[in-house]
Amino acid sequence: MLASISIYDDDQVHNFLKCHFLHWLESLSLIGRLQESIGMVDTLMAIIDQIKGSEISRFLYDAKRFILSYYSIIDSSPLQLYSSTLIFAPQRSIIRNTFHNYTPDWILQEPNTDLEWNAVLQTLEGHSDWVRSVAFSTDSKLLASASDDSTIKI
């Protein structure tokens, strides 16, 4: 069914995301389903019209980087979407610039941030000591990590 569907610049999906992307993430976080956001963005990226979808393609790429970079903050404190995540996003981030007007007025000076996203996509969290070993499952969908704290996380 997805093969017959495509999204493109300034269509309903793109306009919805330009207005409500942060609200959508906040809602998913509040109902405990933030982890589904990455898969949803991936699905949208897969159905972009390659000719008429360059702007939505850049938006979704930036959106995915934004989610991956600030996942733990959004998951634990969804309202930080409107302050901490926006002001610490790279200066040229499409999400930061699209939703800059959501930054609270009480933030008088924004920190100096990188211009672009760096190479870090995601960090492992949850171990209390050095991680000494990591391995992917055979289907590449899971990652296991072993730590000096005598724990294994999947």
What do these predicted regions represent?
Residues N112-I154:
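A detector of tandem-repeat and repeat-rich interaction/domain scaffolds
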